[in-house]
Amino acid sequence: MDMIRKSVISLGLVLLATPVIFGQDLSRYRKFALGSSLAVISKQVGQDGRQATLISESPALVQEITYWQMDASDGTSRSEPISHITFDFFNGALYRIVVVYDQKSIEGLTEDDMVKAISARYGIGVRLYPEIDFPSHDVYAAPEKVIARWDDSENSVTFFHSTGLESFGLSVFSKRLSAQAEAAIIESAKFAKEQAPQKEIDRQIKEVDDQDIARQKNIKSFRP
């Protein structure tokens, strides 16, 4: 009987602990939520959404805005340990948030220190040995290594090291929308490559036409 009672108590403790371990929301980073519109995020960070960087226009619209954390005006250390945050949008919906931490704000912290702090927000993650490459649509970007990862069925959070920036970062993304966005970016790049020869021909023809128009105009008005 005591054994049964202990088993029931243990099971109850596990069930109570489950929401704490697995109930974290992987669709958010602080006040920013995946799926939010470009207009909403632009307003939250005080930017004009019309100035978003165009990554791909076809077969789907992929855009990006970057928010830079400013130092305190009084010269004191910044209140947030963030260098900048990049927001990526697929057809107007936020599908990825990439946070890069300020070097001075995390000076002295080990990878394990940061994984522990992130786990307090997102629950138990998976430490990766060896580290794996962090995907990026920028082919010229320096390599980034994923150190740890937190997953649910729809979203993922990754803690990575940025070689180019010599700092660490956090990425929060929708698995479904990220896959669609990356496919669209690849297709757009492929189409642009296929169209490049014809675009160069069109450019050269236009250049010749423009020069001829300028010649005809100037030959009438030229007085030596």
Predicted regions and their residues:
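Mid-chain, structured segments of secreted extracytoplasmic proteins
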Residues: E64-T110
